[in-house]
Amino acid sequence: MTLIVTGAAGFIGANIVKALNERGESRIIAVDNLTRADKFRNLVDCEIDDYLDKTEFVERFARGDFGKVRAVFHEGACSDTMETDGRYMMDNNFRYSRAVLDACLAQGAQFLYASSAAIYGGSTRFVEEREVEAPLNVYGYSKFLFDQVIRRVLPSARSQIAGFRYFNVYGPRETHKGRMASVAFHNFNQFRAEGKVKLFGEYNGYAPGEQTRDFVSVEDVAKVNLFFFDHPEKSGIFNLGTGRAQPFNDIASTVVNTLRALDNLPPLTLAQQVEQGLIEYVAFPDALRGKYQCFTQADQTKLRAAGYDAPFLTVQEGVDRYVRWLSGQV
């Protein structure tokens, strides 16, 4: 049976395609918008059966042109949290997603989709409950609104619907994302260009570089998606993060030490890196005051209750792997 991945040339979509390939799955229809043509590179080492532009996909899928479809991994969306065109955002992230969902329900195909931790906005609790959901931008709102649709549909759905609220994802195949790429990606490139990594200084009671996020490797994101693909009886909306908040200092320090290791240099402690000017703290920008999350951490209770029991990579493990991968690309 056919598998479909939307956003297939994007960051998470391409990693899911690759993970499916590694399991012997190649009957995959890749759906994307290659107006930004350089994204094609994410699929060069992947095996797919066909490629479709997103503008023609939904109509053809709803018409049954692809025969029996087992599952749709819906990763396609505008993921720029700074986008201010609300009409564009809602059309791409909400209306389009509803159309894909409707086609999946009509055909009995598994629907696994990308939600976002941006739904939580400024909340200090990160649990899949309506009362803690308060998005701060139209991107978060587009994801929030679609999750509300899912909550209404789930009780009567006859096929799987599984949504994943991605936290701060990093890893291979994100180069095309530019400013929206991960902190690890930007730290890597900054250190190679300038010989140092710059982090925000003290803010809101957090020491320099100690603002925290739940940083999750795209390897783990793909594994969770495939776990639910293998268990079509499991539906719901799930946080997808490590359950561990780690500071930006951990990302920067790991980037520095991994690059040093590749140059046959010994590791340094964070204090030594700061002392030697390899990590530099800059004043927290006024423009971000009051709009910046200093802490995120996924509550994994629902994910673990669904049966996913594999460990997640720490920043030290995942970023080390990623930096080595990036170094092999340049």
From Swiss-Prot:
InterPro entries in UniProt: Epimerase_deHydtase, Heptose_epim, NAD(P)-bd_dom_sf
Reactions accelerated catalytically: ADP-D-glycero-beta-D-manno-heptose = ADP-L-glycero-beta-D-manno-heptose
Keyword terms of this UniProt record: Carbohydrate metabolism, Isomerase, NADP
This enzyme's EC code(s): 5.1.3.20
Pfam families listed in its UniProt record: Epimerase (PF01370)
Domain notes: Contains a large N-terminal NADP-binding domain, and a smaller C-terminal substrate-binding domain.
Name under which the protein is recorded: ADP-L-glycero-D-manno-heptose-6-epimerase
Organism: Burkholderia vietnamiensis (strain G4 / LMG 22486)
